[in-house]
Design a protein with these regions (language model features):
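A structural boundary/capping signal
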Residues: 1-190
Length: 190
């Protein structure tokens, strides 16, 4: 939030932090509700339950989603604008998921996938790749291969480097770089 406030230092970030806390609480409650309905303690079922809870709350109840229509709009990379508009870039939406997951003690990492930022959620030895831009859907190897080919051409194949974890700093830098690129395109930076 502090990075987003750089464009408007007088802007109060408290309502944004409060909203993130509310979303975190709702995800935590949804996990509890889904857990009570499920008797399966298998790690695979647990990770799917967590994914379902996040999908129900973040893109479901709060309606956060990718902005495919105005993808290059600078507002899609400004975290406060993303929260206001409920639309954003994959990396901006990923920050929301990461914050919520960490508040709920869920193991999640950003994945610096070529051309499209993703998330990896882990629980009980099971993993899921999540696309925050498209409603938090999970992507299997076939979908990841298709996504890679869309960005790198038909000859591209999945490599271990495509699953490279992005540090919190790398995620923030990627978001800031998106803002910079969009500002340059608009002629705001020389």
């Amino acid at each position: 939030m502090h990075f987003a406030r750089l464009n408007d230092p007088n802007r109060d970030i408290a309502p944004y932090i409060d909203l993130l806390e509310a979303i975190s609480g709702d995800v935590r409650n949804r996990i509890g509700s889904l857990s009570a309905q499920s008797r399966d303690e298998d790690g695979r079922a647990v990770v799917d339950l967590i994914v379902q809870a996040m999908q129900d709350v973040i893109p479901g109840h709060y309606q956060f989603q990718g902005d495919a229509e105005n993808y290059d709009d600078i507002a899609n990379a400004d975290l406060m604008s993303v929260i206001d508009r409920k639309r954003g870039l994959p990396v901006a939406l990923a920050l929301l998921y990461v914050h919520v997951a960490k508040r709920c003690q869920i193991e999640i990492t950003g994945i610096d996938f070529p051309g499209h930022f993703l998330l990896r959620l882990q629980s009980g030895g099971a993993r899921r790749m999540i696309d925050p831009f498209h409603g938090g859907i999970t992507l299997g190897s076939a979908e990841l291969r298709e996504l890679l080919k869309a960005f790198q051409g038909l000859d591209a194949e999945l490599q271990p480097a495509h699953y490279r974890e992005a540090s919190d700093i790398a995620i923030l830098l990627r978001l800031q770089n998106n803002i910079k690129v969009r500002a340059i395109r608009r002629g705001e930076l020389a």
